[in-house]
Regions:
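Hydrophobic alpha-helical segments of integral membrane proteins
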Residues: 13-15
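Bacterial N-terminal signal peptides that target proteins for export
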Residues: 1-10
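N-terminal signal peptide c-region/cleavage motif recognized by signal peptidases
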Residues: 19-21
Length: 169
């Protein structure tokens, strides 16, 4: 009887282990930007533009285009927040900086601009950590999307080491 129980226990244990890979597909682990890093990227982007004399807003979204941080400089227009978020959303949708996407796909720019939450303008930059797209930052308010993008990239450059090691591979 004891021999039967041991064999049954071993067999049951092997059955449970063999079922685990099939069950693992039911759980998805994602790698996305955390609140503190998002806050610091938004802050650095606004400060980078402020040093150049531009009053901007910066919005950081996670890989699902959910807002993680938003910051509007004291004299930035209130509309810059919405535009910055829409730029970041486009970046997440395309997984390409919004300026790069704008140049590559002028044929669908008008259609995308009519989708709620998106705008095809320069100023959205993807955030990559450990080879994973973890979010995007959108900046709006400088006189030109190229200047918005430069402030976003400057913020990412300043926090580059922290961003790169945010995800453990």
């Amino acid at each position: 009887m004891l021999k039967y129980n041991i064999h049954f226990s071993i067999g049951f244990f092997i059955f449970v282990l063999s079922a685990m890979p099939a069950m693992s597909a039911d759980i998805v682990n994602d790698k996305s930007i955390g609140m503190e890093l998002a806050r610091d990227i938004a802050t650095e982007a606004v400060l980078a533009c402020r040093k150049k004399g531009y009053n901007v807003s910066a919005v950081v979204v996670d890989r699902f285009a959910l807002m993680r941080a938003a910051l509007r400089d004291d004299l930035a227009s209130r509309f810059t927040l919405k535009i910055a978020k829409r730029k970041a959303n486009l970046t997440v949708m395309a997984w390409s900086d919004s300026g790069t996407f704008r140049k590559a796909r002028p044929d669908i720019q008008q259609e995308l601009n009519n989708i709620n939450g998106l705008i095809v303008m320069e100023g959205g930059v993807k955030i990559v950590s450990g080879g994973y797209n973890i979010g995007a930052v959108g900046v709006s308010g400088a006189p030109g999307g190229d200047k918005d993008a430069a402030c976003a990239k400057q913020a990412l450059q300043k926090l580059q080491e922290r961003i790169e090691f945010a995800i453990d591979n």
